[in-house]
Every structure is written in structure tokens, then in C-alpha cells.
Regions:
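Short alpha-helix
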Residues: 181-200, 205
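A short glycine-rich, Lys/Arg-flanked "PGG" loop and its adjoining helix->strand segment in the class I
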Residues: 127-139
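A short acidic, Gly/Pro-enriched loop at the edge of an enzyme's catalytic core
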Residues: 104-112
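Class I SAM-dependent methyltransferase SAM/SAH-binding core
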Residues: 52-101
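Conserved class I S-adenosyl-L-methionine
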Residues: 1-40, 54, 58, 142-171
């Protein structure tokens, strides 16, 4: 199965399975909090792997001009419908585009870019992606990259307790893991920083889901909403404290185009 078909297949159920879940929504709000500090109203932001448009909707509501891209036509259709149905009819420009095709986008320069929740984990050549992205951002522009990390104690404990060591340790495989024909790689923070240098310098790295449990634990953990709120509150205070970012389900890198 090709990457576009793989994501087409999950488009209709993505929001119910992640976006609208307690844990998924909590993690997304943590990313939004950082984006609010980096993207000013009126700025132009490129969103890569926009999925069902939840981030594009939030950005446009803040007065940000958004060009939102994804490899999946089905995801883009959900995103277009979501924005059209929103109060006031929020508007973004949608494009079918993969990371590998970024060089063909002719709407640069942008003030910022957002790649949320693991889109870059599906890219085989981070260095090539970084070079392409550098041509689309103005000097001083900000890249917000939220990626799945390789070292996740929550995952080890969860799947080992279920007697599934293969899934517990899947992120440690250097060759990546396979999902519906897509290779998913789990680059460390250090590896991603190296791939994006020298065009980008790192401003901040934070943990998204280190005390919070991973989204796939939703069925069991949603029974404890107060615990999730407490864990999130503590996590937000400690999100940049080393080594928490490198032990999180996702890490958020904030990079500046030099």
C-alpha cells in the first residue's frame, strides 16, 4: 500500500480515534500553546501533513494565513469540509503535497511551518526535507516540528505488561517499523537537529507525552480524567527539563531559519 492510500484508509475515523480523544486533544493543545508564542496573527504559515485540518482550523481562527498540505486526498477532503463547516467558514489553501514534493511548492516564502504529530517520521531522508524546507522559509522563520521519539518508557511498560515485547521495543529498530506499507522511523532529537543544521538552529525542545500516557492507552486511561489533567499540568511545567523531551511519545522541536 502506498503512503497516500494508507492515510486515505484512516481519514474518516482519524478524528474519533485521535483528535477528539481526551489524550489526543490534550497533546494537541500543548502544541498549540507553543505555536501561539511563535506564529503571530497575519503571518503566513505552511502546514505539512495537515491531516484532517484540526491545526489549520485553529491557525486560521487566530488570523493566520495557512497553506495546508497532505499526501492524502481523503484527509484533505475531511479538512476542507471541516473548515467550510466551521462558524464563519474559516479559509485555508489546501494542496496535495508530500514532503518529498515540497520543492515544487511555489507559494513561498513563509513566516513559519508546522508539522504536527509524526508526519516527518514517515520521511526517509530528513536531510533532504530540511534542505527543501529551508528554501520555503524566510530568514528568521520558525519551524515547529512535532515528531515521535524512539525512547518511550510509557510504551515499554504498557506493552510489556500486555506480554508484547515486540511492540514495546519497536521504536528502537534502526530500520524503522512497517505500518500499512509505510516505513515509520523514530529519529532522536539529536538526529533531527543534525539533519536540519546548518539551515536551522534549535530554539527549544519540549516533551509532548512523557508523563501523559500515549494516545493508544485512551480506552483504559480515559476513565481517569482528573489524573490526565494533573499529569498534563505537571508535564507542561517540566516539558523542557532534560531528559524528558527525549523520553516522550512525541517531542516538539522549535527551529529558526538562519
Amino acid at each position: 500500500m502506498t503512503p497516500d492510500c494508507a492515510f486515505d484508509a484512516i481519514a474518516d475515523g482519524y478524528d474519533s480515534q485521535f483528535t477528539e480523544t481526551t489524550i489526543g486533544a490534550t497533546m494537541r493543545r500543548a502544541v498549540w500553546s507553543r505555536c501561539a508564542d511563535r506564529f503571530a496573527p497575519g503571518s503566513r504559515v505552511l502546514e505539512m501533513n495537515c491531516g484532517t485540518g484540526e491545526d489549520a482550523l485553529w491557525l486560521t481562527r487566530r488570523g493566520i494565513q495557512v497553506v495546508a498540505t497532505d499526501i492524502s486526498q481523503a484527509m484533505l477532503q475531511v479538512a476542507r469540509s471541516k473548515l467550510a463547516a466551521s462558524p464563519g467558514g474559516a479559509a485555508a489553501h489546501f494542496r496535495r503535497l508530500s514532503w518529498e514534493e515540497l520543492g515544487t511548492l511555489d507559494e513561498a516564502p513563509f513566516d513559519g511551518v508546522l508539522s504536527n504529530f509524526g508526519g516527518l517520521n514517515c520521511v526517509s531522508d530528513l536531510r533532504a526535507a530540511a534542505r527543501s524546507l529551508a528554501t520555503k522559509l524566510r530568514p528568521g522563520g520558525i519551524a515547529m516540528l512535532c515528531m515521535m521519539g524512539p525512547l518511550v518508557p510509557w510504551e515499554w511498560i504498557w506493552f510489556l505488561a500486555k506480554g508484547d515485547p515486540r511492540r514495546a521495543l519497536r521504536r528502537l529498530r534502526r530500520s524503522g517499523t512497517q505500518w500499512s506499507g509505510v516505513t515509520i522511523r523514530y529519529a532522536s532529537i539529536a538526529e533531527t537537529r543534525r539533519a536540519f543544521a546548518p539551515e536551522f538552529r534549535t530554539l527549544r525542545a519540549s516533551a509532548i507525552g512523557v508523563l501523559l500516557p500515549p494516545p493508544y492507552t485512551e480506552r483504559g486511561m480515559s476513565r481517569f480524567p482528573r489524573a490526565i489533567k494533573t499529569l498534563n499540568r505537571i508535564e507542561r511545567r517540566l516539558e523542557t527539563v532534560w531528559p524528558l523531551p527525549m523520553l516522550a511519545d512525541h517531542y516538539l522541536l522549535e527551529l529558526e531559519r538562519v
